[in-house]
Amino acid sequence: MCTKNQAIGILEEVYIACSSILKEYIKDVYLYGSYARGDYSKESDVDILVTAALDRSELSKFRYALASISSDLSLKHSVTVSLTVKPYDDFMLYSSALPFYSNVIKEGIRYGA
């Protein structure tokens, strides 16, 4: 378990690590779920969503590198870091229609915002 401030620090680490892989394609990075809402417990994972200006097939080329970020940070911080990466266009298209996306926007903490 970590604190909300530590989860926000992990959010920054994810942004830096993903930026080195996705470069200029990275659009947004959100902390969402229980740590963003403040109702986390010792069982909670740190949920992070990254959006990138790439389509699904282009993003799939980076899946192993992105999974490595998640596992490395989980080990470093002794908390499960659940990293989800979505195409930015899909995120924007579905943000008002699908609860997952709308909750990320409504409850999430956007890095750099």
Locations of the language-model features?
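Catalytic core of pol beta-like nucleotidyltransferases
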Residues: 1-30, 37-42, 53-113
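Short beta-strand->loop micro-motif that forms the acidic, two-metal-ion catalytic signature
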Residues: 46-51
